């Protein structure tokens, strides 16, 4: 864009001159932001975009979802976690198997999107993958599972999902499950982690899958910190002191 307000300013149009100065300042800020993003690695740790991955969807084109490859390029976003979300249902065998099938389906959809746009993106599993893909001019997609309901009561599912590329699991969603208590549920079932949940934490540690504590009750949060041998993440939570929400963390939790 070129704009020459000199004649207007000479003629006494100081408003145009101030507007030009405003544009110059904005351009300088944008240039500075671009330089920062050139030097750093940026990663968004949660989006539910895979829920929109139907047969007509193409993440390589401009879609109405919050995340797609054109928007990632415009926002200078290097990597994105795609969450395989499953709604909490009854903790019986029939419904648990449906949840597992749903996670499998969403993972297949993610791989299909990446295969359709292999020249622009790839599945990532490690921090080094993010750096490598940025160097190659590609965007990185990581896979997470939102709600441990999707692994049911079989620890072997954790290994299977790990082998499929899953690198974090959010232990629960808005209701208690067989693993732990949720921050959104009005009643406590386990007062933190269940006995099975402790096994889940141990197995995730063994495999190197990150434990995500967004949606976890505070009692669950402290239990996980007690039993986990690895650092944890909170993929889509903020500070309760700034905004009161059951998914957000107290100052004490943030300091931990």
Where does each model-flagged region fall?
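Amide-donor transfer/coupling interface in amidating biosynthetic enzymes
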Residues: 1-31
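Histidine-centered catalytic micro-motifs
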Residues: 1-6, 42-49, 216, 234-237
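Short, catalytically relevant binding-site loops at active-site mouths
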Residues: 218-219, 239-241
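Histidine/acidic residue-rich metal-binding segments in metalloenzymes
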Residues: 153-163, 185-233, 246-256
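Short, ordered loop/turn segments at secondary-structure junctions
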Residues: 10, 85, 174, 216, ...
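N-terminal hydrophobic targeting/anchoring segments and the immediately downstream early-domain regions
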Residues: 27-191, 244-255
């Amino acid at each position: 864009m070129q704009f020459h307000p000199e004649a207007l300013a000479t003629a006494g149009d100081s408003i145009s001159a101030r507007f030009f100065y405003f544009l110059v300042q904005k351009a300088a800020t944008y240039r500075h932001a671009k330089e920062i993003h050139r030097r750093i690695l940026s990663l968004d740790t949660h989006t539910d975009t895979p829920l929109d991955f139907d047969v007509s969807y193409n993440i390589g084109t401009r879609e109405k979802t919050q995340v797609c490859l054109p928007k990632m390029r415009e926002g200078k976003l290097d990597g994105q976690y795609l969450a395989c979300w499953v709604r909490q249902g009854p903790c019986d065998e029939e419904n648990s198997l449906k949840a597992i099938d749903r996670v499998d389906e969403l993972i297949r959809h993610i791989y299909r999107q990446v295969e359709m746009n292999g020249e622009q993106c790839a599945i990532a599993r490690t921090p080094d993958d993010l750096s490598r893909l940025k160097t190659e001019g590609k965007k990185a997609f990581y896979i997470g599972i939102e709600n441990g309901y999707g692994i049911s009561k079989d620890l072997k599912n954790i290994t299977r999902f790990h082998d499929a590329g899953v690198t974090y699991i959010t232990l629960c969603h808005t209701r208690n499950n067989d693993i732990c208590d949720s921050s959104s549920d009005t009643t406590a079932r386990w007062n933190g982690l269940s006995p099975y949940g402790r096994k889940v934490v141990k197995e995730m540690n063994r495999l190197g899958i990150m434990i995500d504590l967004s949606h976890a009750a505070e009692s669950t949060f402290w239990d996980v910190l007690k039993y986990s041998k690895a650092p944890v993440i909170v993929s889509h939570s903020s500070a309760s002191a700034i905004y009161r929400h059951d998914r957000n963390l107290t100052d004490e939790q943030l300091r931990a």
